């Protein structure tokens, strides 16, 4: 409270710009985007879930076109210390730091944090065909299943359920 009443107040928009939806709102403001706006928070699955939710919004006719994506920027001291406390970070390879990241190697020792972002523009097939767009892919199914297992150790049954829901939504069988 001392700092609060010291006269060093925060900027008026600090809370609004720090909220979970701030990036989504800023992108919409910058580009005049209207329609469904959603900020998805599902750890490593956030961007995949956002794409699935966008596909559903298009399917249900809530929009003709949707910008969807994900980003992560955890490389700040507090985040690194927190991940280190979990004891899941890879041991640094002092001779060849790029070798520290080897996710499919038998000698892997943990994960290496990174930063990144990507965005896609998804649209209804009818909209794309009307404008003569080259169609690169079709999203035909989405499934999302929490497994109520553990924060960092998913239950394979939950992963299987998500795949089953995706196949069911797409009208496909596992062997297709």
Model regions and ranges:
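Conserved catalytic cysteine-centered active-site region
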Residues: 1-53, 86-112
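Short, intrinsically disordered, charge-balanced linker/junction segments flanking boundaries
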Residues: 1-5, 171-176
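Residue-level signal for alpha-helix termini/capping positions
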Residues: 32, 59-60, 168-171
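Short acidic/polar capping segments at secondary-structure boundaries
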Residues: 33, 43-46, 56, 71-74, ...
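Beta-strand segments within the central parallel beta-sheet cores of soluble alpha/beta enzyme folds
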Residues: 38-42, 63-71, 134-142, 175-176
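Short, well-ordered, mixed-charge alpha-helical segments that flank or form enzyme active sites
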Residues: 48-50, 74-78, 148-149
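Condensing-enzyme catalytic core mediating Claisen C-C bond formation in acyl metabolism
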Residues: 96-174
């Amino acid at each position: 409270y001392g700092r609060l009443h010291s006269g060093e107040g925060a900027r008026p928009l600090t809370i609004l710009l720090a909220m979970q939806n701030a990036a989504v709102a800023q992108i919409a403001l910058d580009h005049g985007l209207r329609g469904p706006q959603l900020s998805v928070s599902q750890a490593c699955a956030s961007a995949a879930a956002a794409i699935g939710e966008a596909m559903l919004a298009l399917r249900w006719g809530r929009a003709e076109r949707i910008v969807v994506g994900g980003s992560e920027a955890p490389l700040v001291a507090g985040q690194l210390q927190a991940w280190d406390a979990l004891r899941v970070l890879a041991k640094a390879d002092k001779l060849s730091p790029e070798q520290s990241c080897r996710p499919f190697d038998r000698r892997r020792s943990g994960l290496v944090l990174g930063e990144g972002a990507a965005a896609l523009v998804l649209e209804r097939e009818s909209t794309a065909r009307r404008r003569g767009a080259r169609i690169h892919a079709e999203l035909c199914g989405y499934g999302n299943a929490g497994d109520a297992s553990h924060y960092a150790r998913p239950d394979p049954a939950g992963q299987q359920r998500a795949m089953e829901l995706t196949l069911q939504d797409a009208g496909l069988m596992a062997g297709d």
